[in-house]
């Protein structure tokens, strides 16, 4: 849910400059930035979240063809950016290479983890995959390698072409990106024209290196492609809540299906409202870090669960068996924990707050009603 809010704000950050440069329509700051991002309310982010919610409630589904076209648009935009930015790289723009040291690199890694959210969805197809022992690692690792190469090329092109040194506070410490402190520092230090203060970094880079018209194509690509990301995130989340309600972990009203559109409209509208509210008031940096906290905790739990099941259920049928689990598992635990600790204080506090509320809700409401309670679960036939 929070990840969908972050992408909604990201869409807004490209949409506002796009219509400003293309049609000379300027949305004031207080209507294009959330309260905690230096404005009042992010209307474009609310609009796109509301639109996607409506489409989901009406039963609109992405076809494989449409999704493939949108993926091609995203890839084409990144390839175009790299083709224009990489040739004008200046090595001086990488000096100093790590101005905030290893802690700065770690903090950036914790934030950029948001770019890798969703790769785990490939694993859900293990039972439907031919020879999963061979093909699942190829799919997961292959997609990770390809996307990481793109991330490196894009980041290298952006930083190398125009430079991107961090914005520091009065004490010389780096400021968490995307929040009101960053906005204030950018204004006070007159750095709104720099890459680190830009809301649309790739389009900003192309304008700075002499491609203003092409920069609009990048904004247009984001305008067209990002809503599909929001849709898929919200689709998955609503189905998770629907399944939890069906298992009686959440109120039964969330299992209602619309008689005409045959969609779980109640849970969709509630989820969409939460996405809209978060997108309306919070900056993309805080939302992404908050989403990372929950995702890292989920990955940590999965790694721990796999190791426990490997010990307690040795004979369990496994369409895909994690290789070298006693090496991969501990490395995953350490990596997730390290990245979580490097997240912003705000993200960690929000995570612990929501986790506490979830545990209380489960103890008071869900535990007694759940059909997953041991007394309701029928043992599997060993045959």
Segments the model singles out, each with a brief description of its role:
Residues 1-49, 53-57, 222-243, 277-297:
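Hydrophobic transmembrane alpha-helices that form the core helical bundles
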Residues 55-61, 90, 214, 250, ...:
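Transmembrane helix-loop junctions in multi-pass membrane proteins
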Residues 53-54, 82, 155-156, 223, ...:
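Alpha-helical transmembrane segments of multipass membrane proteins
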Residues 44-48, 100-112, 207-231, 264-277, ...:
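Select transmembrane alpha-helical segments in multipass membrane proteins
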Residues 12, 40-88, 99-102, 140-144, ...:
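Membrane-interface loop-to-helix entry segments
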Residues 37-41, 52, 99, 253-265, ...:
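C-terminal membrane-solvent junction of multi-pass transporters and transport-like membrane proteins
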Residues 23-45, 68-220:
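Helix-loop-helix junctions that connect adjacent transmembrane segments
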Residues 132-143, 249-269:
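Membrane-interface alpha-helices at helix entry/exit sites of multi-pass transporters
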